[in-house]
Amino acid sequence: DINEQVLNMLGTLRKARDYCMAANEKFYLTVDTGADTYTLTYKDTKDPLNLPGESSNVFTLPNYFDITASDVGTDLEFNILGEPTATKTITINTDERTINIVSPTGYIYAE
């Protein structure tokens, strides 16, 4: 279900932001629209961020969940306060849903 996957992605992004805030580390998000994946890294060295309960820092989305547009690009930085450097949008299935990342608050939500 597309809504369940959107909620899963929101939860993962929020968990990564909060985890890095607690660890006093920067967090980086990369979105690959061609592969329909997103990748989490952290620290200035951009080490893989494997969240508790996850086996990888790369998340591959199911075939019905297509990232059709994203201005996140490579290594969107969230500072140690969880604030992204810019407001960004991830579009799912050509305007079916969008995930918004708001600067400077770090608020992450879906429409």
Please name every model-derived segment.
Residues 1-14, 18, 22, 26-111:
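N-terminal helix-rich module
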